[in-house]
UniProtKB/Swiss-Prot annotation:
Binds 1 zinc ion. Residues 562-585 are annotated as: Disordered. Keywords: Collagen degradation, Hydrolase, Metal-binding, Metalloprotease, Protease, Secreted, Signal, Zinc, Zymogen. This is Microbial collagenase. It is found in: Secreted. The active site is at E435. InterPro entries: Peptidase_C_arc/bac, Peptidase_M9_N_dom, Peptidase_M9A/M9B. One of its GO terms (biological process) is collagen catabolic process. It comes from Vibrio vulnificus (strain CMCP6). Belongs to the peptidase M9A family. It catalyses: Digestion of native collagen in the triple helical region at Xaa-|-Gly bonds. With synthetic peptides, a preference is shown for Gly at P3 and P1', Pro and Ala at P2 and P2', and hydroxyproline, Ala or Arg at P3'. Pfam families: Peptidase_M9 (PF01752), Peptidase_M9_N (PF08453), PPC (PF04151). It comes from the Bacteria.
Length: 807
């Protein structure tokens, strides 16, 4: 939802939530962290920075919390930001300065959050930033729609979730919603700025100050329902996410311990279900309402046959079924029989490769009955987000998910859920090979369930890194480019948990797996012998030993690593050197050409990383044609793509891939005269986005339903929920929370419990708040009913195992 697109509607991926903004330089500034530490005027240096600075700000080390990210430094930045807001008159340069200051503040909070046991910034500092945000939203230019102006608005409204001060800013942010109309909705970047209200509402779940505020301001629930009803027209536009999130986050308020807030939110969800019934055009709102009610107020769904509703929806949304000759059964929304057969071929090839690489002997681990795997493929990310969670219980802020279930259960259904990132003749199924590798790895390499695999840590690097390796082999450019940003030791990578960031989990995991497979295959054989027999404690011990043993070798190996494309003949790694006859074409600048029939003029254009749009067009008189190739000179007789027609008006557009960006590199083009042509304008249009700053990892807020004696693995970044139904005859429930990460983990997850409502750090009946993430509760029980649990990470989160026992 970060793309600026006009009507008519073209659905946007819900995962794309951050800004895509111009990569053009704002100023030649010295803005990396080391330079800022030496700057005599920090606020001025930040204000004049360019977009390229953001990545360094967000990836800064925790040492910066003692200098440029200290509370004193941020206090001075707050003063500068407030002054910039007070003098803001809607000019682009002013807006850029505000956005820079805002992103710097967000980066500081991000670094502090990821630093572990470091004191939080004070509430007073957060309140000062909140007052600055309110002052900005009160400015008559706050909601201007220029590119830079929208950037400023988005940065400050997104900051609310960083500083956790929504009770102070919600009135102003609710007021901004009133500017949403059919005209402003055309700018989805601007709409995404309004959507930061709902991001903040989700980020304030279990926040006691927020719940107290809402208990005294329940009119906001009425206003959000009215907003959604009044703007139902937007459900047929690219701005539909704003209406959807208004209702979804209203539903999440059911988790409030305040009875009046909960009751009002439940009533709104029930009205949503009546207005948008399952099977209607916008039934994803019905699904959102059912999701919230089933999580936080299941009693409100009494009488609704959810299993039948799921069967009906699955039959409508995934009507196609194709059985592969191997273990896969493909259910899809829009794959043709030919495409489904091609997917089977891809999976079969990957399976053969897997058995060779992992040396499995094609022998499953003991007690694994997952002989088949269901592959559910949605047509696009929108359908994946709309329907998959309801149908299969997966999270949707990802590129697909493998759901192993209980492999020891003969009636279990192993499944991975995926979606297509394009709907042409190609398969375009995101992470198809990655997720299928998870199935194969679990069946042939990992004894027991997912929780069993994670019970002693030191395994995430393999689970995700091996799946990435099987997909990319030696061609994972993004992972290799990551090395230049700073090396990790092998021991560090081996200690990775799911509470770490995606670069560490997937890309560094890939590098560790590739290193071990290439340099120490016998050690890998030894590790897999342990995991196949369920010896995960011994696995963890051996991995720690190997990390210490090979740290130095791994560092040297990284120095010599290069990308090897899988098909070098068809996708050359090095572009053809331009000859004297090939001229560089500058992006976004037109040149005028004239030529005779059969004449040819050759050009090349370099497309940088983070390009969101790339097209080349000719327009003029006569009859010229356009031909193009990637990384090799294009001619009218030797080219990769052309859209030639009669006349001299042609355009070639290059689609973004699954990452959202056009493939970077050198593109060659030929303008050839089929007849004489004159006054033909040649233009290469390139739009780039600033590298998206990282955001705090998001929790799955769906409560986990526990069973007595069955351990559950939970990754907690900030907040998770769990519940257990206690039957008659139980007098005590005992709950253990165990840290699954390495011994030097700085994570801290606290455990809260209540009988009547979802607990918070302030409103609960029972609590365990020992240092670290090992917690224990013994709760007396007098009658049957639910126990509700909240797992809260006040600073750095953790991977934990949760288990309950009835006595």
């Amino acid at each position: 939802m970060s793309h600026l697109l006009p009507f008519p509607r073209r659905r946007l991926a819900l995962a794309c939530l951050l800004a895509s903004i111009s990569g053009a330089s704002f100023g030649q500034t010295q803005c990396d962290v080391a330079q800022l530490q030496q700057s005599p005027d920090l606020a001025t240096a930040i204000s004049s920075a360019d977009y390229a600075c953001y990545s360094g700000w967000f990836s800064a080390s925790s040492d910066t919390l003692n200098n440029i990210y200290s509370e004193a430094s941020l206090s001075r930045v707050q003063v500068a930001l407030h002054q910039a807001v007070q003098t803001y008159q809607g000019e682009a340069e002013q807006a850029r300065a505000i956005e820079n200051l805002g992103e710097y503040v967000r980066a500081a909070y991000y670094v502090r959050y990821n630093a572990g046991n470091v004191a939080a910034f004070s509430d007073l500092l957060g309140q000062q930033f909140a007052h600055t945000i309110n002052a900005f939203l009160a400015n008559p230019h706050a909601l201007d729609q220029g590119r830079e102006q929208v950037g400023a608005m988005k940065s400050l409204t997104l900051m609310v979730d960083n500083i956790k001060q929504l009770p102070l800013t919600m009135d102003a942010m609710m007021l901004a919603l009133q500017q949403f109309n059919p005209e402003t909705a055309k700018n989805t970047q601007w709409v995404d700025g309004l959507n930061n209200l709902f991001r903040s509402m989700a980020g304030h779940i279990a926040n006691d100050a927020f719940y107290r505020y809402l208990a005294s301001n329940t009119q906001h629930i009425d206003m959000l329902e009215k907003f959604a009803n009044d703007n139902a027209w937007a459900l047929d536009t690219d701005a539909d996410f704003l209406v959807f999130n208004a209702l979804r986050e209203t539903g999440r308020l059911i988790a409030s311990p305040d009875k009046a807030t909960k009751q009002k939110a439940v009533q709104v969800m029930q009205r949503v279900m009546a207005r948008y019934p399952l099977g209607s055009e916008h039934d994803k709102l019905w699904l959102a309402a059912v999701e919230m009610l089933s999580y936080f107020a299941p009693e409100a769904l009494n009488g609704l046959d959810l299993p039948q509703a799921k069967r009906d929806l699955a039959a409508r949304v995934l009507p196609n079924r194709h059985e592969c000759q191997g273990p896969a059964i493909i259910r899809s929304q829009d794959l043709t029989p030919e495409q489904a057969a091609k997917a089977c071929d891809v999976l079969a090839a990957k399976e053969a490769d897997f058995h060779q690489v992992a040396n499995t002997g094609m022998q499953p681990v003991a007690d694994d009955h997952n002989q088949r795997v269901e592959v559910a493929v949605f047509a696009n990310n929108d359908s994946y987000v709309d329907y998959s969670a309801f149908l299969f219980g997966n999270t949707t802020d990802n590129g697909g998910q493998y759901l192993e279930g209980n492999p020891a259960d003969e009636h279990n259904t192993a499944r991975f859920v995926a979606y297509r990132y394009a709907n042409g003749e190609e398969l375009s199924i995101l992470n198809l090979e990655h997720e299928y590798t998870h199935y194969l790895d679990a069946r042939f390499n990992q004894y027991g369930s997912f929780s069993d695999n994670l019970a002693h840590g030191y395994v995430v690097w393999w689970l995700e890194g091996f799946a990435e390796y099987m997909h990319y082999k030696q061609g994972y450019q993004a992972a290799i480019e990551l090395i230049a940003q700073g090396k990790m030791s092998l021991s560090q990578v081996f200690a990775t948990s799911y509470s770490h960031d995606t670069n560490r989990i997937y890309r560094w995991g890939y590098l560790a797996v590739r290193f071990m497979l290439e340099n120490h295959p016998q050690e890998v054989e030894g590790l897999l012998a342990l995991s196949r027999s369920g010896q995960f404690e011994q696995w963890a011990q051996q991995v720690q030993t190997l990390g210490q043993q090979y740290d130095g070798e791994f560092a040297r190996w990284l120095d010599g690593l290069e990308v090897t494309p899988e098909n070098p003949d068809t996708d050359p790694d090095t572009p053809t050197e331009p000859s004297d006859g090939v001229t560089q074409l500058q992006a976004n600048q037109s040149i005028t050409l004239s030529g005779k029939a059969y004449s040819e003029k050759l050009f090349y254009v370099d497309v940088p990383a983070n390009t969101t749009h790339f097209s080349v067009a000719i327009e003029g008189d006569g009859d010229a044609d356009l031909y193009m190739s990637y990384n090799q000179v294009a001619h009218y007789y030797d080219f990769e793509v052309s859209k030639f027609v009669d006349g001299s008006n042609e355009e070639i557009q290059f689609a973004a891939d699954a990452s959202g960006y056009v493939k970077p590199g050198r593109y060659y083009l030929s303008v050839t005269g089929r007849g004489r042509y004159q006054a033909v304008n040649l233009t290469a249009t390139i739009d780039t986005a600033a590298p998206t700053p990282p955001t705090q990892e998001q929790d799955d807020l769906a409560p986990v339903m526990l069973q007595s004696g069955q351990a559950q693995h939970l990754t907690v970044h900030q907040q998770r929920y769990a519940a257990v139904y206690v039957p008659e005859g139980v007098s005590e429930v005992r709950i253990w929370l165990s840290d699954l990460t390495s011994s030097d983990s700085q994570g801290n997850v606290n455990l809260y419990a209540s009988r009547e409502h979802w607990p918070t750090p302030e409103q609960h009946q029972f609590a365990s708040r020992y240092a670290g993430s090992n917690q224990y509760l013994a709760i007396p029980v007098e009658q049957a009913g639910y126990l509700h649990f909240s797992l809260n990470a006040p600073q750095q989160g953790d991977d934990v195992e949760m288990v309950v026992y009835f006595h």
